Amino acid sequence: MSLSTLFSPNTYNINSKSQTLNNLPSNPTSQTNTLWSNNAYNPPHLMFGSTDLSNGGGGGGQKGEKGDKGETGSNGLKGETGSNGLKGETGSGDKGDKGDSGTDGLKGQAGTDGLKGQAGTDGLKGDSGTDGLKGQTGNDGLKGQAGNDGIKGDKGEPGNDGLKGQTGTQGIKGDPGAKGDPGTSVVLSSGIWTPSVTFSTIFTGITPSTSIYSRIGNIVTFSIFTNATIPANMASGIIYFTVPVASSDFNGNNVIGTASITGNSTGVVQYGILTATASTAGIVLSMKIQASTSISVAIYATGQYFIPPG
């Protein structure tokens, strides 16, 4: 309660006694005031006892028992704010009981959502960046493995025969050709003969057998067969044979054929050639056969020679 309320004309109940406080002094703390003479510095609301305040009051009686807690009164009107009073001495009264907890207040309604702000303007477009440096050329990739050969396709079916073309018109008969010059005659002959031996060295037991020849124009082809015996480790041997057809153009420097022995012979041919004699038309066999002992051999000689025209 404020001081202005305390010192306004009001009626207070003190120990079931009523007293109207009127015309209170402006300075209730003065010690010369009769009303406060026995209770200096103690406002009336702190005094206790059964003495009627109108008779001056007696001394304070004994402190009675603490009464029951009264019901909470309604709030009085708020008085005007008085001037600050002097600070009282600290009281030593007992601490009052803790009041009941008040009920929770009602929850306020949710406020409405605020308005959405306007969209900002678009920012300025930045400058284009400079082109990056060109990268180095990469290494060549590894060469791939060769692919497998493809499977050969099936053989196609034979095509149909093409259409026969139309017969062309008959051509114009050409003029008769000029008569040619008379041709030369060509000698054609062949036969068998048994060559004769006109000279020999190293070889012994020479026995020529039936041989063959053929002539086409100026060329004579021949084949001679003969048996002979050679000594062990022979040197080069020679046999002269007569020709089947005479020729006037023999030259000893010309090789006209070769010679060999049959497979049944045990010797080894080191060489065998045929040449021609210049002095007397004949076929010359020059041959060397290697053998560790004297053996008989069968010799085959083939060749060609030329017959001049005339």
Curated annotation (Swiss-Prot):
- Give the sugar-modified residues: 227, 264
Which GO biological process annotations does it have?
Answer: extracellular matrix organization
Q: From which source organism is this entry?
A: Sputnik virophage
A Pfam family (short name) is Collagen
Locate the compositionally biased regions of type Polar residues.
Answer: 1-41
Enumerate the residue ranges of region (Disordered).
1-183
- What's this protein's name? Collagen-like protein V6
Any one Gene Ontology cellular component term annotated for this protein: extracellular space
